[in-house]
Regions:
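Catalytic-domain carbohydrate-binding cleft regions of carbohydrate-active enzymes
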Residues: 1-267, 274, 417-581
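Catalytic and substrate-binding regions of extracellular carbohydrate-active enzymes
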Residues: 198, 206-209, 216-460, 569-573
Length: 581
């Protein structure tokens, strides 16, 4: 989300405070392993003093103190981390916080359960006064000892953030609406103090929420059909049940049995189409946001969402890679895979050496997935039956034909028209037939004196169930790569200033900034916010920082996540990038 949407989110609790005579100074985030430090200014300015982060029981916990002062510039909040949804917290002033959580999507405790809880706590703390309270009550006690807390200035990030790229269309529309919103507000076309604005923003908030569909292990149920051919047949058959857990995953089925019967009743059955309806339900938040707008703005939004395959004039001249190509007032050179390697301005004589637009298609097998699962996860012995379907791909390792591969394209047509360069690409046939690589890609480059604009299109992509990723590399080849900064919520963050066991590999950004006394470069990715600094690192979860001399790898699509996310993608797509000098 952007800063205005986050501020709107925080304003909801402020309005409720006014309505109910409450004063919110505490916040709680449960399940997701972390957030960006870019949130700190917004939270602090909204009056939030204390943030509790309760991490999913099998996810890696960032290596930060249990309680600390998170400082971003002049703004700060107290953050408390727990290795589960909530743990016991004892302050030096004699205050103890005990959480009593229900399970996900479960009802609140019964009166009897609360009576039992108070009895248990009375035995545990025989000399204490025990009362039900709010996080605000605890935050006031934290305020008393705030000055004793360690200070953290590092980014933490979110080690689940790869899920952002599971539905490129939805995220593209979301990002374009955020950009349009700013233009509409500036022009007076969209009034902040209007009912339509509230409905618009509320639906955008629902897109940003971390659950994006039905649970794979409860509603798709299929951990058998990883092979492309069998997946296509199973999807067409459109029936799943507990037998799709397969013989090799019976331990998972046993662990999940109680929950499965709770959700399905006696007969555990589902279907691919039922699972897919939940992803359309999530996309509908985009449609509802648009429907809330005045008619004129609705039309603008629909035009912004629309795109078509690039059309080149018949008279446009043809060229090849590795030769000088005149494009308007520029001379450019392409590499063997269609990437832009050099741009010379014929008027100023300035030459830019870079690597822009190298697209790569990556597939993964059970070896890579299992290694990531065991490296990233914790307490797996206790939580294996739900954590492996969430973070792994159960049964994939039995399919030896599904392997790790990195495919690169070949230019099949290079054409020019005025200041525009068209590059049409194809990947090796295996990437599309055995896996899910789009059969056709096009890159359109627009050249200006101080900017290069790049559009990437793909079409004819097959859906597959096995893990895949589509990357594009942008590398302006700067002299001092440590000067790059990530823009998150209007806060600039160094890619190498991320805490141990935070997300050092993937970031969701609004833009990238390179700033020195000699040069400024801004990279803006309108549609694809997920970026891996220095290397392609979807299934790499170690704590090394990658080499920024290699540039940035934008992750256009992946299906690593299990749980509540789309598991395949087959639609045509378009992505816009701008590199400003």
């Amino acid at each position: 989300m952007d800063r205005r949407l986050l501020d709107y989110d925080l304003s909801i609790s402020q309005k409720m405070d006014q309505q109910f005579g409450f004063h919110t100074i505490a916040a709680k985030m449960t399940d997701v392993p972390g957030h960006t430090i870019g949130m700190v200014p917004a939270l602090a300015q909204a009056g939030i003093e204390y943030l509790h982060l309760g991490v999913n029981a099998s996810s890696r916990v960032p290596d930060v103190p249990p309680m600390f002062l998170w400082k971003c510039g002049s703004e700060e909040i107290v953050v408390q981390y727990a290795g589960d949804y909530g743990e016991v917290s004892a302050l030096s002033n004699g205050t103890v916080l005990e959480f009593y959580h229900a399970h996900d999507n479960a009802a609140p405790p019964t009166p009897q359960e609360l009576d039992d809880l108070f009895e248990t706590l009375a035995a545990r703390y025989p000399n204490a006064h025990i009362e039900a309270g709010t996080l605000e009550d605890f935050a006031l006690k934290v305020r008393e000892i705030k000055h004793t807390l360690p200070v953290i200035t590092e980014e933490i990030g979110d080690t689940w953030i790869h899920g952002v790229a599971t539905d490129p269309w939805k995220v593209s529309c979301f990002r374009r609406l955020l950009q349009l919103k700013e233009a509409w507000i500036a022009s007076g076309q969209l009034l902040v103090a209007s009912p339509s604005y509230d409905v618009f923003m509320e639906n955008l908030l629902l897109v940003a929420e971390h659950t994006w569909g039905m649970d794979v292990k409860k509603y798709l149920l299929d951990f058998t059909n990883w092979n492309k051919k069998s997946f296509i047949a199973a999807r067409a058959n459109d029936h799943t049940d507990e037998t799709f857990y397969d013989a090799c995953n019976q331990a998972l089925l046993t662990g999940m049995s109680e929950e499965l019967h709770h959700y399905h009743g006696e007969h555990i059955t589902s279907s691919y189409s039922k699972f897919e309806t939940s992803h359309q339900e999530q996309r509908n938040y985009i449609l509802r946001a648009v429907e809330a707008l005045p008619e004129e703005l609705q039309e603008q939004a629909k035009k912004e969402f629309a795109f078509s395959w690039p059309s080149v004039p018949e008279c446009a001249p043809s060229f090849h890679a590795n030769e000088p190509i005149p494009v308007g007032s520029f001379i450019v050179t392409l590499g063997a895979h269609g990437e832009l390697l050099q741009v010379k301005n014929n008027v100023s004589g300035e030459i830019k050496d870079l690597s822009l637009g190298l697209i790569e298609y990556e597939t993964f097998g059970g070896k890579e997935v299992d290694a990531c699962y065991y490296d990233y996860g914790r307490d797996l012995k206790d939580n294996y039956y739900w954590s492996e379907p969430d973070f792994g791909k159960p049964g994939l390792h039995y399919h030896k034909e599904i392997r790790h591969n990195i495919y690169t394209p070949t230019p099949v047509s290079v054409r020019t028209d005025n200041n525009t360069l068209y590059v049409f690409l194809q990947f090796p046939q295996e990437a599309s037939e055995a896996y899910g690589c789009p059969r056709e890609f096009a890159i359109v480059y627009f050249f200006e004196n101080h900017a290069i604009c790049m559009q990437i299109f793909w079409k004819n992509k097959d859906a597959i169930r096995s893990p895949e990723a589509i990357w594009v590399n942008i590398n302006p080849q700067v002299i001092e790569p440590t000067c790059w900064k990530l823009n998150k919520l209007n806060t600039y963050i160094s890619p190498d200033h991320v805490c141990y066991d935070g997300n050092r590999k993937l970031h969701c950004v609004q833009k990238l900034l390179y700033h020195t006394n000699q040069k400024n470069i801004v990279i803006t990715s309108l549609d694809a916010p997920l970026v891996s600094p220095g290397a392609k690192t979807l299934y790499t979860t170690d704590n090394t920082f990658e080499d920024l001399n290699n540039g940035f790898f934008f992750l256009l699509y992946n299906n690593r996540w299990g749980t509540n996310f789309k598991q395949w993608y087959e639609e045509d797509m378009r992505f816009d990038f701008t590199i400003q000098y």
